[in-house]
Amino acid sequence: MINTAKYFALLESLRFSKALANTANNSGTAEALEINLRILEKYAKLEIGQQLHELCLEYQLTDDHESSIDPDSDRTICYIIRLQHVLHSIMRNINFHSDAKEDLISVAHLKLCIQASQELSYYSLRCQLHEDFYKSPIFCEAQGKIKANFSLMLLSIQFFINLLHIRQYHIANSMELVQRDLLAAIVSLRVQQDSPLLDKAIAYLWQYESKADFFRNILLFKATTLCPTLAQLLHRQLLGKLHLPQGFASLVEALHQNPNVNSSRNAEIVASIVARKGFSQLAQEKMVLQVLEYCKFYLQNADKMCAGVLSLRRLYDLSDTNQKLIKEILFKHWETLCNPEDIINGLILMDHQELCNRILLWQHLFCSSTVACLPSNLLVPYLPLLLQLYDGLPMELPASSQISAIILRCLDNREMKNELPAILQKLFKWEIEKEPPWKCLNPRIIILPSMNTTQIQVKVAHKDHLADHDMGRILPGLLTSSSHHSLTCKVFLSLLGFIAKQINDKSSASVDFISSEAELKDFLHSKYQLKLDLLIALNQMVAHQPLRAQLSQHTKELLHILKDLLVHRSREQDTTDQILLLVLNLLQEILEGSENIQLSEACKELKEQLHLLGTRSSNPLIQQSVKSLLTIIHGAWRPSEAVKIQPFQRARSLIEEKQSHMQVYGIQMMIDLLKKRDPATLAQGQLIIALALTTLKDKESYTFLNCVRLFVSLVHVMESDVLDKLSDEYLSETAHLDYRLVVGEAILKVAQELGPLCFRYKAVLLNCFMYGSRSPVHEFRMSAFANLAQLCRLLAFQVQNFFHELLQLVNSELTTGGYVPSKRAAVLVLAELLNGMENLLDYQEMLLPIYRLLKAIEADESCDPQMRQHAANGLKILNKKCTKLIQSALEEKSLQKQIKVLGIKDDDSPQRRNRHILELN
């Protein structure tokens, strides 16, 4: 045993300039090293050769290695050996792994050991790396401090591997840079020659130290341009460790340590490393399992899940074997619910948390994004199971909305013409055992609330229990509770086409040989249950208000289905009249709710088939329904009381009234509906524009001013449509002058409401008013110039592309125009244009003519006072801008701009005492 107190006293007398805590003030490094070395030589009992021999024996270096280290050749080598021996002596005589009082050391002494270790790692590791490492800014400072010595580096590596076992040294990440330098040193030696000691050193760093730090350091090294041998070695280390346990998770963690890179970028980097064609199939399969385990672990962390899901998708795309493996793993997620091993009454198969976690995992895997998740066609076989789970979950649970998103993603990505109808047909017929078979809940399984009402349990029910699969109730309920209205419309059209086929198909079933009640029940179910489910589903969906708005955009498909149905009914008299009657009632509800469908060409083509159906059918209810439909198509229909109470129709009816106060009340209702984003109102955007333009012609100012407010609200829903319609109306030569002037006011109000977004439509707005300023109608021309002046101010004077044309219009009006109010407005435009000139030098050839014109107008006492006032304002603006320009020019002593690089060919003038801050240093 040695007296460790003397060694701590020795460390206290040294100054560690390269320790992490002292790097901010490391001037005089060479002097500090020399001073430290003298102190070590003074108090060391052993000669340096004996210290070296003792270290080589302890760390398993051969005699050849020892002989290749010459301490006398370099003072730095001597310093490395002596400092290493001091730390080795402390490590050997203090049991850092013991909690006994006699083995504990003070925090100050532990800090000395850490600083000495950091100093030693700088000289013994960082200063002896492969020359290519010094291309990196993190290592370049250590280049040329010492000539690299293979044996000395190997000795230092062995020393630090033993030192890193002491966990107290790792406090506050004190060994982070030591581990980085150690890994770089190991790789540098591996390039020169292989050694079992180096393999063990890398294995230790991977197994016992932070795996995330290992990957981070490897990626840090690879960021530098290295020689092929070194680059390949690092690449092999990266890929080799990646396929070891926890490799994928550690790689993601390493990239997430950088807060400046977003999660999507990190995910792309990870996926490009993980999903490579060069990996063996076995390695790819192991990686798939790793990634899935990672996703399960980080379910609640969306940022980290992004990397896992994207990597899994890239692995899925690599090979058919990977696809098969992923499909098998996905099936095992629900095997307990589809094919439970034990079916014992009351047995709990899955608790609340497990079920919610599995649903959340699938949401991440399939709904995280459009490109980074697994393909949605994998979900098709699980649709029955997912719909049953959705039906069993309480609506207030997050898992309910999550599983809803999964189902919606699957259905929405299916092709509408063939694929989606085929899926819906298989669901409603419940032919899930046909090839390819689909998965569903075991008939004995039931989802019930647990003792805690906010949680659920999946249990085995009584043997007489049958799992519910009422698609006519479950699927429409899911669709109408979501905001995915376009998908609701697709499903509605598919189901409508499906029921049309069911009505047209003659049933092959016969009642002649039914001999029992069970057979009768099966016959009735097979003949009528499917049609009943379809009608219930359609009835539930057609009552969904947003669906009608969507159907107005799919008029052609809807009416094509109905036309085929009517053609078949006119040929076949034995079709079920009750089903046809329900379909006709559905059509009437849709037509009553959408005027666009009533006016479509396809709807008018139905008239012939409806006439034929009405004359051939003996059913009075069908005849009455046909009569009502023909009335709607002919345009003689008036809204029913049920339709009138709908918010949009009520607002529209009020606007169409003759009394001003009723119109304004209807306008306010319409504005409120637009603010609430009412789906039925938004779907009638073009109709609202037409209604507003008609109301704008009202002579009552109370009405048309409120109508302008309606345009202001409407612009938030359909910007370009509103501006295009208003511009066309403003420039219409056939419209009344007062109406055109009001439209101009509406355009300005709409532009004000758009604010900065108005810049996107400046071409439409400016061209509209510039065209109007050429009108032969004096009042209209004056209005156009006034609107131009206000528009220039709204656009923050960003009218450079139109500047010359605007000046020509103003000049033409002032020289040839005879209407004084128009001239006033033209001078106002000129003043506003001067206000918008950011740099007068860009328009210097026009400044003198503008100045002379404004000066002449202001000086002419016979001129209109308002014109003189506008001209005076323009001159003030011009004077202010010219003064500012001249002042800035005087400050620079030249109107020419100069770019001067300070410090190059500068004459140091003694007069320049107050130098610029960039010239300091």
Curated annotation (Swiss-Prot):
GO terms for biological process: Golgi organization; protein secretion. The keyword Metal-binding does not apply. GO terms for cellular component: cytosol; Golgi apparatus. InterPro entries: ARM-type_fold, Rtp1_C1, Rtp1_C2, TANGO6/Rtp1. Signal peptide: none annotated. It holds the Pfam family RTP1_C1. Keywords: Cytoplasm, Golgi apparatus. It comes from the Eukaryota. It is found in: Cytoplasm; Golgi apparatus. The keyword Cytoplasm applies. May be involved in protein secretion and Golgi organization. PANTHER family: TRANSPORT AND GOLGI ORGANIZATION PROTEIN 6 FAMILY MEMBER, TRANSPORT AND GOLGI ORGANIZATION PROTEIN 6 HOMOLOG. Belongs to the Tango6 family. This is Transport and Golgi organization protein 6. It comes from Drosophila melanogaster.
